[in-house]
């Protein structure tokens, strides 16, 4: 695995340049499985009232670099969302039981998480919150030097967007992602949806 030796990635979640929470990934090797756990927690407050919040726990398992298991539980504004995904060897597909999709998925789908550089090669991404599958188009914008916590990194700047015009505006997505090939890390993600959002690397070990 490209992530041998990596123990954790911590990212701040910002909205309109203000830190409102975090998303943290923890990596472990369990015999022949590579296991990634994620904890995400953030909330947007307006005049002291929480108007939007996410509290999420996920676990994904890989065998020989291939996804075999994914499970997530999320509270979005107190509404529960979930995904249970398993690789079914007999049909060579993923079987998903999610809050917004139940059924099969082909193996060219990648979970839409911000630790995994496979997202740049994927034609479809699975929502880690609800299990929905969306086709995506990935474009390389170019090489850019960016500053993260006072340190300069050379990155590849990608744009990832949903390419199904029939999706409602609410379900469409477009992300800009800055990836550092040297240490295989996604350093920064930005998008606009009711504000300017940014996921930014805080630390890794």
List each model region and its residues.
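Acidic, serine/threonine-rich low-complexity disordered tracts
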Residues: 1-88, 118-205
């Amino acid at each position: 695995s490209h992530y041998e030796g990596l123990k954790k990635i911590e990212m701040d979640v910002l909205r309109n340049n203000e830190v409102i929470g975090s998303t943290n990934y923890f990596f472990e090797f369990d015999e022949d499985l590579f296991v990634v756990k994620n904890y995400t927690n953030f909330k947007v407050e307006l005049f002291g009232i929480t108007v939007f919040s996410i509290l999420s726990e996920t676990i994904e398992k890989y065998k020989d670099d291939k996804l075999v298991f994914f499970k997530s539980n999320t509270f979005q504004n107190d509404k529960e969302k979930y995904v249970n995904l398993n690789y079914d060897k007999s049909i060579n597909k993923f079987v998903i039981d999610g809050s917004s999709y139940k059924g099969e998925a082909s193996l060219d789908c990648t979970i839409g998480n911000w630790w995994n550089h496979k997202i740049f090669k994927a034609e479809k991404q699975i929502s880690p919150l609800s299990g929905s599958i969306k086709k995506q188009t990935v474009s390389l914008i170019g090489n850019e030097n960016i500053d993260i916590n006072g340190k300069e990194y050379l990155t590849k700047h990608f744009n990832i967007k949903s390419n199904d015009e029939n999706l409602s505006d609410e379900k469409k997505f477009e992300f800009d992602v800055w990836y550092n090939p040297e240490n295989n890390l996604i350093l920064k993600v930005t998008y606009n949806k009711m504000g300017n959002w940014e996921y930014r690397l805080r630390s890794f070990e």
